[in-house]
Amino acid sequence: MPKKDRAQEAPSRDVPRPEEGQTICVVKKMLGGDHLIVLCMDGKERLARIPGKIRKKMWMREGDVVLVGIWDFQPNRCDILYKYGNDEIKRLVNENIISREVIDQLRG
């Protein structure tokens, strides 16, 4: 018996927005060993670390838009919290959280 056709609808989940101590960044360079260099919306380059919880679930590459949590005791370093997909980036642009020009400029 064939399987039933089910509508392929993406679940509409909330897109994480930056809170205090968090910012949106673009991956600039992969360093290896779960470290990357990211260019943030505040204009700073930071050394980012991929925590073990998302290391194997989420693959990163240059040009990806990510949400990072900035370290309190070392503001030039951060942890990757979430990787935005293309549809989520569009939702952030539509909600005026970020502008398309800034993302294009950060991506180079």
Swiss-Prot record:
Sequence ranges assigned to domain S1-like in this UniProt record: 11-85
Pfam families: eIF-1a
GO cellular component: cytoplasm
Name of the protein in its database record: Translation initiation factor 1A
Function of the protein: Seems to be required for maximal rate of protein biosynthesis. Enhances ribosome dissociation into subunits and stabilizes the binding of the initiator Met-tRNA(I) to 40 S ribosomal subunits.
SMART domains per record: eIF1a
Single annotated GO MF: RNA binding
Entry's Gene Ontology BP terms: translational initiation
Alphabetized HAMAP family for the sequence: aIF_1A (MF_00216)
Keywords: Initiation factor, Protein biosynthesis
Keyword Protein biosynthesis: yes
Family (UniProt): Belongs to the eIF-1A family.
